[in-house]
Regions:
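A detector for short, charged/polar N-terminal pre-domain segments
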Residues: 1-11
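Short amphipathic helical patch at the helix-1/turn junction of helix-turn-helix
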Residues: 10, 21-22, 51
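DNA major-groove recognition helix of helix-turn-helix/homeodomain DNA-binding modules
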Residues: 55-70
Length: 74
């Protein structure tokens, strides 16, 4: 069960990376647009942060001009 949870959280990072790259935004630029540290963005995308808060996801979604649902869907 934990493996499934980890896979879904890794999916969030992969979705963020995909959306960010589709928009041509660097990790550094996304961190500034979302008012988050670069380290936070890097950790989420790489799977190092397996528990991003809804506040963090909302900031990222707003910066990418997408819905939070777009970050968490498979």
């Amino acid at each position: 069960m934990a493996k499934s949870s980890n896979n879904s959280k890794n999916l969030i990072g992969k979705n963020i990376r995909k959306l960010r790259q589709e928009k041509g935004i660097s990790q550094d630029r996304l961190s500034k647009l979302a008012d988050l540290s670069l380290n936070t963005i890097v950790n989420i995308e790489s799977g190092g942060n397996l528990n991003p808060t809804i506040e963090t996801l909302t900031k990222i979604a707003n910066a990418l001009e997408v819905k939070v649902d777009d970050l968490i869907r498979s």
